Amino acid sequence: MSTKNRSDKSSSSSITKDKYTIILPTYKERENLPIIIWLISTELEKCFIDYEVVIVEDNSPDGTLEVAQQLQKIYGEEKIKILSRPGKMGLGSAYMDGIKKSTGNWVILMDADLSHHPKFIPQFIEKQKKLNCEIVTGTRYQSGGGVFGWNLYRKLTSRVANYIASVLLTPGVSDLTGSFRLYRKDVLEKLITQNKSKGYVFQVEMMVRANQLGYQVGEVPITFVDRIFGVSNLDSGEIVGFLKSVLNLFMNIE
């Protein structure tokens, strides 16, 4: 680990009161949003965790923005912040825009479709404090983790894709494509700025860059549940595209 990153780590440990910003990019999540917000509120408040949720809404045609506004009235503007964008502008830009509205010193990235249960967030925080690390990522591929709602084909393709990416890129984590993660805010900003990938490979490059820069990453086993409402966007074409993008990342990453 570089001297700079070691000094960064020691300065972060001096913070006595942490606040966690949860960034939720949304597109057509009308049914899921009220449930995930309720779960976040329930799980974090019972652990006395200081938090806020930033909903980054990409002009959903199903009324997701209106639902978000109703939730803001229920939970309050201090807990629920809304950023309305003109359309789908990419995951990286959604995270960066969410960071700009955040007031926390730590940022949690997760999906709004109920694939990621907020009950794991306290475990992420506990792991971070135990290791004093800059990043914690959820993993489906360690003991205690798993996937529910996927057929055998999808499980196998996910495993194979992760294995190929791990062999080529040696990122030091067991679940490269997961998007349920805790970052120190300044670290997240730096990684996103350097990230050149799109789609599912965006998450892969985040871990590869983190490893290159000497950041420590903790892992917490999670159970991933396929979305209840709405349609999953993953298909065989995207899997092929993912593998091509991983190869491109391997050839070009500096």
UniProtKB/Swiss-Prot annotation:
Mn(2+) binds at D113. GDP-alpha-D-mannose binds at P25, Y27, E29, V56, D58, D111, A112, D113, R140, R227. It is found in: Endoplasmic reticulum. InterPro entries: DPM1-like (IPR039528), Glyco_trans_2-like (IPR001173), Nucleotide-diphossugar_trans (IPR029044). Pathway: Protein modification; protein glycosylation. Its cofactor is Mg(2+); Mn(2+); Ca(2+). Keywords: Endoplasmic reticulum, Glycosyltransferase, Magnesium, Manganese, Metal-binding, Transferase. Transfers mannose from GDP-mannose to dolichol monophosphate to form dolichol phosphate mannose (Dol-P-Man) which is the mannosyl donor in pathways leading to N-glycosylation, glycosyl phosphatidylinositol membrane anchoring, and O-mannosylation of proteins; catalytic subunit of the dolichol-phosphate mannose (DPM) synthase complex. Component of the dolichol-phosphate mannose (DPM) synthase complex composed of dpm1, dpm2 and dpm3. This is Dolichol-phosphate mannosyltransferase subunit 1. It comes from Dictyostelium discoideum.
